[in-house]
């Protein structure tokens, strides 16, 4: 990654639902130096497996880095893809099953600018030296 992102572990373990990615070799113009970070915190339904989450992360990373245009357009494409994933999972549930829902924190560092999108209960703290 172009940016030095320190990842702090929670009780010595990776944070469940957190994912960070650097640009792929083939990406849309303007995405070369972008850093993508996602945090999905499931709020209801049976737990989504780590394998399913990883496949979602792989898919939306590809979508983000291949989407041309503004950073916010690429972020919107990621949010729409994740929402579609949740809808697909929920459509397969029985009537008695509790639907899946999740909070999302999505951040992109583009050059020296931080873009943040959030859905559901979440917060962002920006800390800097000085």
PLM regions and their residue ranges:
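PP2C/PPM-type serine/threonine phosphatase catalytic domain
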Residues: 1-130
């Amino acid at each position: 990654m172009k940016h030095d992102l320190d990842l702090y572990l929670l009780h010595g373990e990776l944070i469940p639902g957190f994912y960070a990615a650097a640009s792929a070799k083939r990406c849309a113009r303007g995405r070369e130096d972008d850093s993508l970070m996602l945090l999905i915190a499931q709020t209801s339904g049976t737990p989504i497996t780590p394998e399913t989450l990883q496949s979602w992360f792989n898919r939306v990373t590809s979508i983000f880095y291949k989407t041309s245009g503004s950073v916010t357009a690429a972020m919107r494409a990621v949010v729409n893809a994740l929402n579609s994933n949740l809808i697909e999972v929920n459509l397969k549930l029985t009537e008695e099953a509790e639907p899946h829902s999740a909070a999302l924190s999505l951040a992109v560092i583009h050059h020296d600018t931080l873009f943040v999108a959030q859905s559901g209960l979440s917060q962002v703290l920006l800390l800097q030296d000085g």
